Amino acid sequence: MSSGKKFKIVFNAPVVLGFSAICCIALLLSRLTLGVSDKLIFSVYRSSLADILTYFRFIGHIFGHANLEHLVGNLTMILVLGPMLEEKYGSKDLIFVIVATAIVTGLVNFIFFSNVALMGASGVVFAFILLSSMTGFRSREIPMTFIIVAVVYLGGQIYDGLFIKDNVSQLTHIVGGLVGSILGYIGADK
């Protein structure tokens, strides 16, 4: 009855799995510290440049999430898209995409929104969405799927930003998508 073939669990996308684990730990820390860890490390907001934690927050904000629903929403997309991207571009390049997205979205929030604390991986999600639609990109060709994804996702965020008032940072989604698109274009030869 047994064919002798055994299945094993593989650690197929270490960056994506590590990122996801850090996000889960950040949410747990937030609950254990009653949100103090979010204020210290896992959200970015206008603060003194003399405060060393300000610089950690430019990256740390992507790990913090307001609640379990926020975390699950972001990690679902990251765990669906991330392994494919990590396989195509490699772990180092995917870390670069994540860190670049964190820094750019953190700086945009820091500079332009003095009274807003930003947290969550949605900028990374949008970077992954647009980057994944660029995986078939060849020099001097733009995939139709990229155009459709850009119009649907970025257009939707522009619409939401103009007409819907909520606690979602559509600008972070747009900036994350732009980072993913630009890095996808630059890395098209891989």
Enumerate the predicted regions with their spans:
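A detector for small-residue-rich transmembrane helices and their helix-helix packing motifs
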Residues: 1-190
